[in-house]
Design a protein with these regions (language model features):
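Active-site helix of classical SDR
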Residues: 40, 76
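C-terminal helical subdomain
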Residues: 100, 118-160
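Conserved NAD(P)H cofactor-binding loop of Rossmann-fold oxidoreductase domains
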Residues: 8-13
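Active-site loop immediately N-terminal to the catalytic Tyr-X3-Lys motif
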Residues: 18, 65-71
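Substrate-binding pocket helix/loop in short-chain dehydrogenase/reductase
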Residues: 16-17, 24-26
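Active-site-adjacent segment of SDR/Rossmann-fold oxidoreductases
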Residues: 65, 86-96
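Residue(s) in the substrate-gating loop at a strand-loop-helix junction
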Residues: 60
């Protein structure tokens, strides 16, 4: 059996909307939303048939509040959040649990191609291990319990421009 489907693909294109190409818009929506929807559609019949399993999406703090120069990124993460909420309702009686993790800035290669990054102090970003711990809490929850949504935030939101 499949215990969990973890949807964790994502990329960021941060700019004012008019500075982004149509190809940029499609890329962000395809990676951040469509890839999750397509793989989930592929696995859902199996999970429902076995009557158990977790579907976990990596959302973002950007799924909770729009931000300047984040229009398409925020839209893609809002889409994931709405998708997870609707899917949770669709799967309610099947034994399949649906959750979303909304991390803030995570110190990962996500920022490699962006012109900003979290501040250097440890409290300016969460670590990948923090997100992994939240994920394990979700999938190890007692059967019948759904941790619908978890936000994982740095203690202090400090951003710095790259030189």
């Amino acid at each position: 059996p499949v215990k969990a489907l973890i949807n964790n693909a994502g990329l960021g294109k941060m700019a004012f909307l008019e500075q982004l190409s149509v190809a940029d818009l499609r890329l962000v929506m395809d990676v951040n939303f469509m890839s999750h929807a397509i793989i989930t559609k592929s696995f859902l019949p199996l999970l429902k048939k076995q009557g158990s399993g977790d579907i976990v999406f990596t959302g973002s703090e950007a799924a909770l509040k729009g931000s300047r120069q984040g229009s398409i990124y925020c839209a893609s993460k809002f889409a994931i959040r709405g998708f997870a909420q609707a899917l949770r309702d669709e799967c309610g009686k099947s034994g399949v649990r649906v959750s979303i993790l909304n991390p803030g800035a995570v110190r990962t290669p996500f920022f490699d191609e962006l012109n900003f990054e979290p501040g250097a102090d440890p409290e300016n970003a969460v670590e990948a291990d923090d997100v992994a711990a939240a994920l394990m809490t979700v999938i190890e929850a007692r059967p019948g319990t759904v941790l619908e949504e978890i936000s994982i935030s740095p203690q202090s939101h400090v951003w710095q421009r790259k030189k």
